[in-house]
């Protein structure tokens, strides 16, 4: 039986446009790749790559604790169903709630911080809440990837990363210009 990898994101189009090569490389390495994202019209394209897709209900920009709690429960159930060898998370809600679900299920996971977003731009109660959520979501990550040094410095300064947490700054992501 193939080992599986679960990829959590908040956008099927973003996953397809910016992470298609990652998905393909994982499958070429022999993994069964599961993808959990909301369906905005790209899930069929992701399925055609060979991935197993799990449509996910998520408010990308909302801050409703009940809906976010449902997302956390959905991730927990998905982990129990798939039993992945590892989980890759992208974007804020999958990073936070996927990270918590993985830690509770004792599933190894990697976090990718693609940017900090507008909620972390200004000091205040909302920033404090998001920092606390990030700290909780990333506390068990095997590695946290950043796309620039500034985001890494911010997360360190705010105490979102434990000293033992491995971090890497990668050269970012983008659209494959050859397609």
Predicted regions and their residues:
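Active-site proximal beta-strand in glycosyltransferases
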Residues: 4-6, 102-119, 134, 145, ...
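N-terminal strand-loop element at the rim of the active site
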Residues: 8-66, 154, 165-166
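Nucleotide-sugar donor phosphate/pyrophosphate-binding loop at the beta->alpha transition
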Residues: 17-18, 66, 70-73, 108-110, ...
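Short beta-strand scaffold positions
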Residues: 37, 88-89, 146-147
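Alpha-helix capping/helix-boundary segments
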Residues: 41-42, 93-94, 150-152
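Donor nucleotide-sugar binding/catalytic pocket of nucleotide-sugar-dependent glycosyltransferases
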Residues: 54-55, 135-179
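Short His-centered aromatic/hydrophobic patch
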Residues: 89-95, 113
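Acceptor-binding helix/loop patch of EC 2.4 sugar-transfer enzymes
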Residues: 112-128, 157-158, 163, 176-178
